[in-house]
């Protein structure tokens, strides 16, 4: 069976100038699709076990998968990690005025296994962890 995780991330362009968002978004998409490490994220086969949406109207990429084996040795996981690394590179480039922001959250089966990464001017409501109690009554 293996260890399972729930995973979600979003990459967004949130510059005040919407024209800048559009240009940056499509430049980022072109770079990601041309890069061997990230291109597979955009293949239809990769979407069979997860939700991967390129939202052109809102200049964002959203990903969500429940109960998956999120092992760093898996090619599909490496692709998504590479896409997040590309977003981080864009965010950390001082000459880049793209307005990129991203948030990644992975929750493992163990209660203390939570991984979070973020960058840019992100909003807490995009992706976050909420604790709750389930009951059968």
Where are these regions (language model features)?
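Short, extreme N-terminal segment that most often corresponds to the first beta-strand
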Residues: 1-31
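Charged interaction segments
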Residues: 30-137
């Amino acid at each position: 069976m293996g260890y399972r995780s729930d995973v979600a991330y979003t990459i967004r362009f949130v510059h005040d100038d919407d024209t800048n968002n559009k240009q940056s978004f499509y430049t980022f998409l072109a770079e990601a699709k041309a890069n061997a490490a990230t291109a597979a994220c955009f293949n239809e086969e990769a979407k069979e076990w997860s939700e991967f949406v390129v939202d052109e109207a809102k200049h964002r990429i959203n990903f969500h998968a429940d109960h998956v084996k999120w092992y760093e040795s898996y090619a599909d996981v490496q692709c998504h990690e590479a896409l997040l690394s590309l977003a981080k590179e864009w965010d950390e480039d001082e000459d880049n005025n793209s307005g990129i922001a991203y948030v990644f959250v992975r929750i493992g089966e163990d209660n203390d296994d939570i991984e979070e990464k973020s960058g840019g001017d992100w909003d807490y409501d995009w992706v976050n962890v909420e604790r709750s109690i389930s009951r059968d009554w």
